[in-house]
């Protein structure tokens, strides 16, 4: 099973200019390498059979005859291979010459796509030799003794996979053919190119490819000429680039004097999901040509023992790399802007935050402090309330108080033990029974205190609950589930931890830094059950519901891409290889889906809060789900997974 992945390759062979039979030998070698690696579709550079830099030799019948003969020999020599192959070759039709992409598989040519936009400026003179696809009248072409489909609007389809083709300059125009092809159904675009190197051009090219793949919500496979092309005036560095929906999946090294084979997988299931969800995608169909694209069917082989070569990020919510600082600051800016607007609109004089010494309340307090700074309001008007209860440990209590003081926030301590004991007497509950009533009473008592203090001080209660807790329903209904504005509702637990650590290392003084780092290292817990005999946290959330890094991974792929459970399991196996065994992944995947469906009623009445990332559970925006939906289909699929 390949879970919607199509293994593709961009090949950059060594060439000798005008030596067609040498060139097809190199092409065949790369085809066979790709076949051994399970590649299903492989693309070669523009005019790869002859070399791009033949120039006026393209007017020579000897070269054109040789190119056609070499093409037919290549098709025949590789008849036993299953992979669909796309090569560039000059072909004659209607007494004209076209710069063509020829598609073939298992000894048969499937179709021919001529280049549409022929550059004729500066170093490019393609109109000197070639005719644009727009000038052609015929829809077939003769190669050897056979006729084959020809046109710039050919699509190649196998099941849910639909491939479209454009050639080099086609990508660089305002409305590339790929834009039209994707609206006709193409989900992978192959670009056969011969793009010479200039200072700064590669960065622009990479950006162009990623942007086009994002605009088209498609995979994009780009193969450009490399070593062996004439260096009379130009240098070709050999670019193999594979992108998917704006993300760069794989790229070849440039300026190598060896052949290149760049392989990755395009996830057509997630692309289909994105197109279905983003209903704006098909608005451009009104501008399509009246004649529909011609579809050529082929069969893509699904190899046994499918393996994924593309990386799978185990922490898809957390930023990394060069954009780290910018991304973290952007997240805080969104949270601050949302809270600032609400405070101003409500004419609030204070903000009330319950501080437990845990990650979520810490992040909420940091956001509130930044908001008051942005509004030029004194931090002392923020009221940080610590409410020690039956399960509060010295570590979390001390961290809560130290953090509030170090940030210049007003500290208020309201113990809740006596109030809860009175409540237990009122409802006739035995306090030695540590059940759901025992736990939730504490959460609701704290929320009541926060709400009343906010009313008393003309303030807003700032919610602390995060996206992961909302997904799992790990919150007390009308307890910590409720607030007047929730700043963390779109932030998953793995990102909460990351943001707090980032602030500790970059934004605060040493005193606050030490406190924040200790909070990061504290086990995640609601602290509703008394501590153990040593005064340490006894109730650890991840022991009860599972590791948050797994749940955040499940959540991301379920909501962002609409992935089904068995695919999420497959991806998690790769992402967490060596960290969690298969049985553990399956166990917590089942827990995730069971709880996600059971706990929707809590998400149906969430407080307002800003959307930060692409995944959100707001019932007013991103996630509208009935509270009584049944999880049977999802859970039964998980049960069928073989470990």
Language-model features, listed with the residues they occupy:
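ATP/NTP-dependent adenylation/nucleotidyl-transfer catalytic domains that generate, transfer
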Residues: 7, 15-18, 23, 159, ...
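Enzyme catalytic cores with a strong preference for nitrogen-chemistry domains
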Residues: 1-354, 370-379, 411
């Amino acid at each position: 099973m390949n879970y919607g992945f199509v293994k593709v390759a961009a090949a950059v062979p060594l060439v000798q200019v005008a030596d067609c039979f040498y060139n097809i030998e190199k092409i065949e070698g790369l085809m066979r390498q790709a076949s051994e690696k399970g590649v299903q579709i492989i693309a070669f550079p523009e005019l790869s059979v002859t070399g791009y830099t033949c120039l006026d030799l393209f007017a020579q019948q000897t070269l054109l005859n040789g190119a056609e003969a070499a093409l037919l020999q290549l098709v025949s020599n590789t008849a036993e291979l299953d992979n669909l192959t796309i090569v560039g070759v000059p072909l004659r039709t209607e007494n004209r010459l076209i710069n063509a992409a020829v598609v073939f598989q298992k000894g048969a040519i499937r179709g021919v796509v001529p280049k549409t936009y022929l550059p004729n400026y500066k170093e490019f003179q393609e109109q000197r030799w070639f005719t644009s696809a727009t000038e052609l009248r015929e829809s077939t072409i003769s190669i050897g003794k056979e006729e084959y489909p020809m046109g710039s609007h050919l699509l190649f389809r196998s099941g849910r996979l639909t491939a479209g083709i454009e050639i080099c300059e086609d990508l660089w125009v305002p409305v590339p053919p790929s834009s039209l092809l994707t609206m006709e159904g193409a989900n992978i675009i192959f670009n056969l190119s011969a793009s010479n190197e200039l200072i700064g051009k590669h960065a622009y090219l990479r950006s162009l490819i990623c942007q086009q793949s994002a605009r088209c919500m498609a995979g994009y496979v780009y193969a450009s000429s490399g070593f062996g092309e004439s260096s009379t005036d130009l240098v070709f560095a050999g670019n193999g680039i594979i992108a998917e929906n704006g993300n760069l999946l794989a790229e070849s090294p440039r300026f190598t004097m060896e052949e290149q084979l760049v392989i990755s997988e395009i996830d057509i299931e997630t692309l289909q999901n994105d197109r279905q969800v983003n209903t704006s995608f098909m608005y451009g169909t009104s501008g399509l040509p009246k004649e529909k694209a011609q579809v050529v069917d082929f069969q893509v082989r699904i190899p046994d023992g499918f393996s994924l070569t593309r990386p799978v990020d185990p922490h898809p919510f957390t930023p990394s790399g060069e954009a780290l600082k910018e991304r973290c600051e952007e997240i805080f800016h969104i949270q601050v802007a949302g809270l600032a607007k609400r405070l101003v609109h409500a004419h609030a004089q204070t903000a009330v935050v319950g501080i437990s010494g845990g990650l979520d309340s810490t992040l909420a307090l940091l956001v509130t402090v930044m908001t008051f700074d942005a509004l030029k309001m004194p931090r002392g008007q923020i009221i940080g309330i610590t409410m020690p209860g039956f399960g509060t440990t010295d570590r979390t209590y001390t961290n809560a108080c130290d953090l509030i003081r170090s940030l210049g926030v007003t500290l208020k301590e309201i113990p809740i033990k006596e109030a809860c004991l009175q409540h237990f007497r009122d409802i006739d509950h035995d306090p030695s029974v540590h059940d759901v009533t025992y736990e939730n009473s504490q959460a609701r008592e704290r929320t009541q205190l926060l709400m009343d203090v906010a009313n008393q001080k003309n303030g807003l209660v700032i919610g602390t609950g995060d996206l992961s807790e909302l997904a799992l329903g790990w919150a007390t209904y009308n307890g910590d589930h409720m607030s007047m504005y929730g700043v963390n509702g779109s932030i998953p637990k793995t990102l909460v931890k990351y943001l707090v650590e980032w602030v500790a290392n970059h934004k605060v003084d040493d005193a606050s830094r030490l406190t924040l780092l200790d909070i990061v290292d504290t086990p995640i817990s609601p602290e509703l059950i008394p501590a153990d005999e040593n005064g340490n946290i006894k109730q650890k959330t991840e022991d009860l519901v599972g590791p948050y890094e797994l749940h955040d991974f499940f959540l991301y792929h379920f909501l962002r891409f609409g992935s089904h459970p068995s695919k999420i399991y497959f991806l998690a196996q790769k992402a967490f290889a060596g960290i969690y065994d298969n049985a553990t992944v399956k166990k917590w995947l089942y827990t995730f889906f069971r709880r996600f469906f059971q706990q929707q009623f809590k998400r149906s009445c969430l407080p307002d809060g800003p959307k930060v990332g692409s995944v959100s559970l707001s019932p007013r925006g991103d996630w509208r789900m009935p509270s009584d939906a049944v999880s049977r289909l999802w859970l039964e699929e998980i049960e069928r997974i073989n470990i």
